[in-house]
Structures are given as structure tokens and as C-alpha cells.
Amino acid sequence: MAVPKKRTSISKKRIRKNIWKRKGYWAALKALSLGKSLSTGNSKSFFVRQTNKS
């Protein structure tokens, strides 16, 4: 079983955690942006079928 030899420093742990959080932040921002463009009809990457309500 692999066991780390030394304890990870607090600063290194904080750096890794911030990188992980930043990735999630950008993914959420892109998803929100895509949702906004789909709702306004400005999306260039998705084709949304329009339903006629009459």
C-alpha cells in the first residue's frame, strides 16, 4: 500500500485546492453563459427547435 513519506505543507495544499476550485468556477461560468445564449436565442453552437404556440 502506497503511503506518503512526508506531510504536504499547508501552502501546497491551499494552492492545489484553489486550482481545483478555479476549474469548477470556470465550468460553472461557461455553463451559465451557454444557458443565457440559449435562452436569448444567440447561441451559435446549438440548434434549438422552436415550438409554435397558437
From Swiss-Prot:
Q: Which Pfam families match?
A: Ribosomal_L32p
What subcellular locations does the record give? Plastid, Chloroplast
Q: Which coarse location class describes where this protein primarily resides?
A: plastid
InterPro entries reported for this sequence? Ribosomal_bL32, Ribosomal_bL32_plant/cyanobact, Ribosomal_zn-bd
Question: Mind telling me which SUPFAM superfamilies this protein's record contains?
Answer: Zn-binding ribosomal proteins
User: Which Gene Ontology MF annotations are present?
Assistant: structural constituent of ribosome
Swiss-Prot/TrEMBL GO biological process terms: translation
Q: Which UniProt keywords apply?
A: Chloroplast, Plastid, Ribonucleoprotein, Ribosomal protein
- Superkingdom of this protein's organism: Eukaryota
- Keyword check for Ribosomal protein, yes or no: yes
Q: Does the keyword Transmembrane apply?
A: no
Instruction: Write down any Gene Ontology CC term.
Output: chloroplast
- Cross-referenced PANTHER family, in alphabetical order? 50S RIBOSOMAL PROTEIN L32, CHLOROPLASTIC (PTHR36083), LARGE RIBOSOMAL SUBUNIT PROTEIN BL32C (PTHR36083:SF1)
Q: Which family does it belong to?
A: Belongs to the bacterial ribosomal protein bL32 family.
Protein name as catalogued: Large ribosomal subunit protein bL32c
Gene expressing this chain: rpl32
